[in-house]
Regions:
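Acidic, glycine/proline-rich Ca2+-coordinating loop motifs
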Residues: 1-229
Length: 229
């Protein structure tokens, strides 16, 4: 059965355990856990997310699957909403709540962190794919409010590079803005709702593009590949 509840944002279909059957990774937003449905080959699937990886993203957005190191195993990229610089992180994201984190884990959900994940496929154990999250080591853990990753060989060197689409029209999570709004009474907020929405800050953010360095790390290539504002 794959009829599980989740705030699903995307799904990637690939043969993660190299058994000839397509599996399904479902990326879920907020505390609802991701699912990794392994194809049993008989029309049924089994969720193996906890057996396959130690951690996932929290605000899970888009995903893409590809072999990033040409070892014949399919890896997975999942984007979240962590800004690359400290100023934007503090302005737009609350700190992780340890009490909420552990209550979620103790309720049977997975370990989820507010950063991108790059799940490097290490092979299989009894038909279950085993992943290591190398997003920080690879240099792709924080790419702002990201929507979807795309792997492709953009420079034609035989390795999968990474494009990430980003951005929102307004800074809808800007904490300084909401601190100012909170100073206005509830009725006045209703009366001035349109004016207040127009005052919401905005900050253009580049889409990100990363060159695959061939050693499971990536380098941001926006300037070199003319993909900056």
């Amino acid at each position: 059965s794959i009829f599980n509840f989740g705030l699903a944002i995307s799904a990637s279909i690939a043969d993660f355990n190299n058994d000839g059957f397509e599996d399904i990774y479902v990326s879920n937003d907020f505390s609802t856990p991701d699912f990794l449905y392994i194809n049993n080959g008989n029309g049924t699937f089994t969720d193996k997310i906890k057996e396959s990886t130690n951690q996932t993203a929290f605000y899970g957005m888009g995903t893409d699957a590809a072999d990033i190191n040409n070892d014949g195993l399919i890896d997975l990229m999942q984007v979240d909403m962590a800004a690359q610089d400290n100023r934007r992180q503090k302005a737009n994201m609350a700190s992780m709540n340890p009490e909420l984190f552990w209550s979620t884990v103790n309720a049977g959900f997975h370990h989820q962190y507010m950063y991108n994940t790059l799940q490097l496929n290490r092979g299989t154990v009894n038909g279950t794919p085993i992943f290591s999250n190398i997003a920080f080591a690879a240099g792709v853990a924080s790419t702002d409010w990201s929507w979807c990753p795309l792997f492709a060989d953009f420079d034609n060197d035989g390795r999968k590079d990474l494009f990430i689409s980003n951005g929102t029209r307004k800074e809808v999570n800007n904490r300084d803005y909401f601190k100012q709004v909170d100073k206005i009474s509830g009725q006045e907020q209703l009366n001035q709702s349109l004016a207040l929405s127009l005052e919401m800050p905005e900050e253009p953010i580049d889409n990100y593009i990363f060159k695959n360095n061939g050693n499971t790390t990536f380098s941001k290539a926006n300037e070199d590949w003319s993909l900056s504002h």
